Amino acid sequence: MKAAVLHTYKEPLSIEDVNISQPKAGEVKIKVKATGLCHSDVNVFEGKTPVPPPVVAGHEISGIVEEVGPGVTRVKPGDRVISAFIHPCGKCGNCVAGKENLCETFSQVRLKGVMPDGTSRLSKDGKEIRTFLGGGFAEYAIVGENALTRVPEDMDLEKVAVLGCAGLTGYGAISSSKIEPGDTVAVIGVGGVGLSTIQLLRASGAGRIIAVGTKKWKLDRAMELGATDVVNSKEIDPVKAIKEITGGGPQVVIEAGGNEDTIHMALDSVRIGGKVVLVGLPPATAMIPIRVASIVRGGIEVVGNYGGRPRVDMPKLLELVRQGRYDPSRLVTGRFRLEEINEAVKMLEEGEAIRSLIIP
């Protein structure tokens, strides 16, 4: 099959033929329909998330079940599915406790580029090729069955592909924030996750929703999707602006940028006694200093949120799509053939895309 393979960090991806094995126990082979391109993939390409190459990335996958391994019961060949970027084992303590987004088994292998048994299902010329959270930049992908959710026949598979990360992470952020109807919320970062969060906040009954970013066209999109106010942090002091808009700061700040400046912005702008939810992922080795005294004296609650629960939250997201209360296609700014993936990567790196779909 064809796949976009990274051989060297910071070098273009290579489109080449690779071998894919049969799915093992609990695994599912998918014929890929579309895969969203996310900044987390770019972090792999740049070596900021150091998954060992050669590696095939791509973790917002939609497609058709081609084959199932022994013991698979949740899906069958022919099913239309989306894959979450989190692949829960379903058996560890966290999975059993309902926190499958924090699966202990998955956490041990997600940055190694292998399946839970320590091996990959891709190879070429007898050498293993690793995958990042599914390896969807290819014609086929193999993932654990617990990552998959069936998609109704009347729903466009391309439209829902980005639910696997952008949608699921936005949903998880709101669940962690425990917002009440009418609460004021600031969302820092208006990429795929931030814009998903804004749509889902509107669906959840949030009051004032403030979008913070640096690109006017993305802030305009945020207003279209449910933001009540926007702050361009390149043009004005964002912390001062957020506090002025909210009369002292929002009850909740959701940080979706994943860098030092935006994390500090979130901590500095939240209301005394408020909550900061961190969902943006910095590079895996990043260390960010914070003023702990301000957090303690302000009674600020800081919560880290990693994605959402595939088996619990993904069906709820699909229902919101069906009801017309969440439209993931509004995040998609481009559609590229697999052979054009390097062009899509460049656009995302330059801030000229939100989500691009890669079509094998």
Curated annotation (Swiss-Prot):
The keyword Glycoprotein does not apply. Its EC number is 1.2.1.76. Zn(2+) 2 binds at C89, C92, C95, C103. Keywords: Metal-binding, NADP, Oxidoreductase, Zinc. The keyword Cell division does not apply. Gene3D superfamilies: Medium-chain alcohol dehydrogenases, catalytic domain, NAD(P)-binding Rossmann-like Domain. It holds the Pfam family ADH_N. Binds 2 Zn(2+) ions per subunit. It catalyses: succinate semialdehyde + NADP(+) + CoA = succinyl-CoA + NADPH + H(+). GO terms for molecular function: oxidoreductase activity; zinc ion binding. This is Succinate-semialdehyde dehydrogenase (acetylating). It comes from Metallosphaera sedula (strain ATCC 51363 / DSM 5348 / JCM 9185 / NBRC 15509 / TH2). The lineage of its organism: Archaea, Thermoproteota, Thermoprotei, Sulfolobales, Sulfolobaceae.
